[in-house]
Amino acid sequence: QLEGRIGHMAIVRTKRATARVNLAAIEHNIKVLKETAGVPVLAVVKADGYGHGAVPVALAAKSAGADWLGVAFLDEAIELRNHNVPGPILAWLLHDTDDFAQALDLDIDLSVTSLANLMEISALAKMRDLNARIHVEVDTGLSRAGVAKADLENFFSKFKTIDNVE
């Protein structure tokens, strides 16, 4: 639970511990990563910023030049938007019960693992007269989630025909 902020420090308190997170160090690390890699940076702030406070960590990352923010669950992305965190946010572990309409309304990118999710998101985007930004999760062999290798050709051939997604 974020308790407050003192300068470049975020104070996060739980029942058993208090963390003082040096946000300037996070900003420095993002800047070094961005300069060294020379490519866009997606800062992962899932799980409440790994227990460091998702909102202050996300804002520090954006301040340092992170191009994207990534979270596991849609409710985490919604929390960031509700705290006015700007820029692209990707939520990659979606559930059938998630409110995809709210995600579209809040300009959140979504990762899909099935044609059913893709079709639902497409229909919602069409009703809003916008294009949903979709990322396709591919099962790379761990059998955890994603479109299976055997289904990729079929998935992408159908993806190309679906309106209101990019």
Please report, for each region that a protein language model flagged, where it lies by residue.
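Short, Lys/Arg-enriched N-terminal segments with co-localized hydrophobic residues
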Residues: Q1-H8
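Conserved PLP-enzyme active-site core in the AAT-like
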Residues: T36
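Active-site-proximal beta-alpha core segment in soluble small-molecule metabolic enzymes
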Residues: A10-R13, A17-R20, A25-E27, V39-E166
